[in-house]
Amino acid sequence: MPQMQIRDLGPCIIVWNNLEVGKSIGNVKVKFEQATADVQEDQMGLTKVDLVTMGYKSQEVTVPATRLTLSQIETVTHNAVKTNQSVEFFNAAGEDLYDLSEELILKPAQDGAAVADANQWWHFMKAYPITKLDVGYGVKDQRVWDITFTVFPSLGTGSDFGLTHRIGPAIP
C-alpha cells in the first residue's frame, strides 16, 4: 500500500528561518481549522441549507521542543537576545508579527536526519513562533518548550497570494 507523500509515521526535523529548531519530544502537530458561516432560509427553519467558507479560524504548527541550545532558544523566543553564555528575555508589546514571520519546513526524519527528498517536505510560507514556557523541575519530568508557530497566508502578489502551505519542493 502506498504511503502519504509526507510519510505515514515518524518524527520530523523542524526548520524555521533556515535554522533547525531543535529536537522534539512528543508529537509535532499541524492544526488548520476552516471557518464557515451557515446559510439559512426562513422556509427551512433553523436548518442550514448551505455553508460559506470564511478562511481559516486557526493555522498552527505546535512543536514540543527539548534540549534546545541557547541559539535555538533565542531564535524561537520573541525578544530573546543571546549574550555570551546566557539568553536574556525582554518584554514586547504592539509588534506586528507577520513582518517577522519566515518559512517553516517540516522534513520527515530517517535515521535522525532529514530526508533529502524535498517532495516529502511540508512548507509553511509565513510562520512565527510563540513560545509557551511551562518548565517543570522534577525527577521524571523532562523540560519542554512548547512552541506554537502561527501560520499566516502570503500577502504577496502573484500566484502565491493567499498561499499558506504546500507539500513538495519549495516554490522556485
What role is predicted for each listed range?
Residues V28-F32, A118, F161:
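Mature extracellular/passenger domains of Gram-negative fimbrial/pilin and adhesin proteins
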Residues D42-V49, Q85-G94, P172:
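Surface-exposed ligand/attachment interfaces on beta-rich extracellular proteins
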